[in-house]
Amino acid sequence: MLLSTAIFAFFLNCAPCLAKFPIYTIPDKIGPWSPIDINHLSCPNNLIVEDEGCTTLTPFSYMELKVGYITTIKIEGFTCTGVITEAETYTNFVGYVTTTFKRKHFRPTVSACRDAYNWKITGDPRYEESLHNPYPDSHWLRTVKTTKESLLIISPSVVDMDAYDKNLYSKMFPNGKCLASPPSAICCPTNHDYTIWIPENPKPGLSCDIFTTSKGKKATKDGRLCGFVDERGLYKSLKGACKQRLCGVPGMRLMDGSWVSLQKTEAPEWCSPDQLVNVHDFHTDEIEHLVVEELVKKREECLDALETIITTKSISFRRLSHFRKLVPGFGKAYTLINKTLMEADAHYKSVREWKEVIPSKGCLMAGGRCHPHYSGIFFNGIILSPGGDVLIPEMQSALLQQHIELLESSMIPLRHPLADPSTVFKRDDEAEDFVEVHLPDTQKLISGIDLGFPEWKRYFLIGISVLALLALAIITAACCKRFKRRRRPKPNPIELIRKVSVTSQSGRAIPSWESYKVGATGES
């Protein structure tokens, strides 16, 4: 099997996604020792998973993360705010018109907002018309209200989507998260009660363009899927894999942190929240190939050491370090007992801290116990110093350390950083250059006659008016009476004199001086 296990095998028996990286391989199972001849020495092939036993290869296609994929998944959309603009005019007695503009809000609908958004992107002329205030009307001594409902569209407004559960995140959402449940969410409420966020694409899941289709070979054993060879020729096992969905696509997270759209017959458990997927950038892809070259180089060094041993017919415990298996799996362990070369079957595991190998001074933990030494020699070049310390030849590749550190530093976060805060709708009454307003039909309301005064002034004016009218009525009546008197005909002076009478001292009525005079003359 070409170039197998370079990356995955190193993690085969490691706990997934811990903070430490593997530094060594040590047998967790080691069989009885048996003497062998020098000619029976063999170098381990670190590019083969010897404990898989999967030899049947079948071509297939699968999806994996794109090389160069950036962690944040941007979803473009727009915000929609329902605004009611009201123009109120009053015309007073002398014809002076006062206009007052007021602004209120209403909750918009998704369909109306999407129609308004289409107006903007298509350049509909109604968009420009809808930006103006409603044209105010006026009537004498009346208050006229003209209202217009508008939809303010601000775009673009970019939010972030979580690749794991397809949730949307932005500072404009309450608590930073869209409250609508994905993937059926077609709008998200915002911190503004009358503003909603709507994705440009009605199906935001289609915007999750982070996958690429690759071709590889499935590795099976007796019909059981146990791994696959990827497009780069690297073998990856499904041991320790867990189920993980990315952007709604089912797949599996392997123990090395990579993701593949592959499902095992024996359904594994779902990944825990701390088991994140590693991004696949160009640096990681380059390191994977360098690791393969490093493992091949180590095998060549082992073969050179084996050639020297066979040629010189001599061996030292230091040279036995070349025969240690560098990746987890089945292999061999070698030691010297009483100057005799000994061999044992072993199953190697990866360790992440030296204290797992040397828990205490003089103790080499192998096979679940402190392994005994023979004249200060353990196995695979590990010895006991005169001071009682366990000395292990450093076999860790710097490239392997670099690769693991890179993997652990390039996980897809569960929450992504905010895109551009400047795209958030700032104030309730702010209409920027990008604003698009939906223009419904205007509504007019004409009130009754209104003098334009407050309530108490209105009644005071009515009372004064009543008193003024009453006084005017009285004055008018008096004037009319005088006028009528002046227009009556004047009586005859003679008749008037005759009608005048006086009363004498005796009490007898005397009609007038003339009659008295006439009467006196007659008597004489």
UniProtKB/Swiss-Prot annotation:
Give the bilayer topology. Single-pass type I membrane protein
Among the Pfam families in the record, one is: Rhabdo_glycop_FD
- Residues in compartment: Intravirion: 481-524
Q: What is its main location?
A: virion
State the InterPro entries in the record.
PH_Rhabdo_glycop, Rhabdo_glycop_CD, Rhabdo_glycop_FD
Post-translational modification here is noted as: Glycosylated and palmitoylated by host. Glycosylation is crucial for glycoprotein export at the cell surface.
The signal peptide stretch is 1-19
Source domain of life is: Viruses
Q: Which UniProt keywords apply?
A: Glycoprotein, Lipoprotein, Membrane, Palmitate, Signal, Transmembrane, Transmembrane helix, Viral envelope protein, Virion
Give me the segments passing through the membrane: 460-480
User: Any keyword Zinc?
Assistant: no
Fetch the Gene3D superfamilies from UniProt: 2.30.29.130
Q: Which GO terms describe its cellular component?
A: membrane; viral envelope; virion membrane
| SUPFAM superfamilies in the record | Viral glycoprotein ectodomain-like
User: Which residues are annotated with the lipid modification S-palmitoyl cysteine?
Assistant: C480
Places the protein is found: Virion membrane
Q: Which cysteines are disulphide-bonded? A: none
Q: Virion surface side of the membrane: what ranges?
A: 20-459
Subunit description: Homotrimer. Interacts with matrix protein.
What family is it from?
Answer: Belongs to the lyssavirus glycoprotein family.
- State the protein's purpose: Attaches the virus to host cellular receptor, inducing endocytosis of the virion. In the endosome, the acidic pH induces conformational changes in the glycoprotein trimer, which trigger fusion between virus and cell membrane.
- Other remarks in the entry: Arg-352 is highly involved in rabies virus pathogenicity. Its mutation dramatically attenuates the virus.
Name of the molecule in the record: Glycoprotein
